[in-house]
A protein has these predicted regions:
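Bacterial N-terminal signal peptides that target proteins for export
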Residues: 1-12
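N-terminal signal peptide c-region/cleavage motif recognized by signal peptidases
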Residues: 17-18
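C-terminal domain-boundary segment and adjacent tail
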Residues: 24-30, 62, 72, 233-280
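Acidic-and-aromatic substrate-binding clefts and catalytic sites of carbohydrate-active enzymes
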Residues: 42-47, 68-81, 104-109, 163-173, ...
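Hydrophobic residues in well-ordered beta-strands that form the structural core
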Residues: 64, 96-98, 188, 225, ...
Length: 280
């Protein structure tokens, strides 16, 4: 299996996404004409089982952006312990994108290297680990984007879509150009779709975040949450996720994966003729 992925390379893992994106066993009844797009970035994974239960109960296909982050149990989000969890999500028909391997937060563009290649300064920080300041060339940043896709294919047998989310949403035109040259298109989130699960829970209690989301979210919005935030004392997902889902559905909204978003649909189908990664 490792040899198969090595031969396919990034093109096989990403460009096959349109042909091999996991499909649900049965599509939910009825057309989704007022969609919102629920997305999750990795985190400490403490609420990941709950998130999976809620999504399955309501037949929601979401989009996950993956980084190699520390977990509450002392492992990593993309280690062998979590491989079955990711395989199950893939089989349910969710979408997956890169969140960079080391959770690199862009700080600034640097002068080009001697060969003219773009360079960037990042703060790599994940969970409770000490931040690391490091400098990467465009080529090295490309490798940081590719590693989650390669690892995801290795542990699940499914390809990752050619999309990424920059940690903290911090980018520059040069960074986006470097990612695009590497085969990745950036996905952010809507202003109303910032669900606030990484905010201080004393200043932004769950009830307030839920009320705000239900009031402000509109069709077409991309929503952002996480699979566990170390710094939030009162976890968001147990209190807010299901009421948010049912509340938005009561307003006539529905949920769709990013492959159905008008901005990304063509991109995520672009590799329909490519050889797909295979299930192990």
């Amino acid at each position: 299996m490792r040899e198969l992925f090595r031969r396919l390379g990034l093109a096989g893992l990403l460009l096959a996404a349109g042909a091999a994106l996991p499909q649900p066993a049965s599509a939910p009844a009825g057309a989704c004409d007022k969609p919102v797009y629920l997305t999750f970035d990795t985190g400490h994974m403490g609420v990941a089982p709950l998130v999976a239960e809620v999504l399955k109960r309501h037949a929601i296909r979401a989009t996950f952006f993956l980084a190699d982050e520390p977990t509450l149990t002392g492992g990593r989000t993309l280690d062998a312990q979590w491989a079955p969890w990711w395989r199950e999500r893939a089989a349910e028909g969710h979408d997956f994108g890169s969140h960079t391997w080391a959770h690199d937060i862009w700080l600034e563009d640097l002068p080009p290297g001697p060969d003219g290649e773009a360079r960037f300064r990042f703060r790599a920080v994940a969970g409770q680990e000490a931040p690391r300041i490091r400098e990467l060339s465009a080529g090295q940043y490309c490798e940081e984007l590719k590693k989650p896709a390669q690892r995801f294919a290795e542990i699940t047998g499914w390809p990752m879509a050619p999309i990424f989310r920059a940690p903290a949403g911090r980018t520059s035109p040069a960074l986006l150009a470097a990612a695009k040259a590497c085969g990745f298109t950036y996905v952010g989130w809507s202003r109303a779709g910032f669900l606030g699960d990484e905010l201080n829970s004393d200043r932004y209690p769950n009830a307030q975040l839920l009320e705000k989301a239900l009031r402000e979210i509109r069709p077409g919005d991309i929503l952002l949450a996480h699979l566990g935030i170390w710094s939030r004392q009162d976890p968001w997902a147990p209190a807010v996720l299901e009421p948010l889902v049912t509340g938005l559905q009561a307003r006539g909204l529905c949920f769709a994966p990013l492959r159905e978003h008008p901005r990304y649909a063509a991109l995520m189908k672009a590799g329909a003729a490519a050889t797909p990664a295979r299930k192990p």
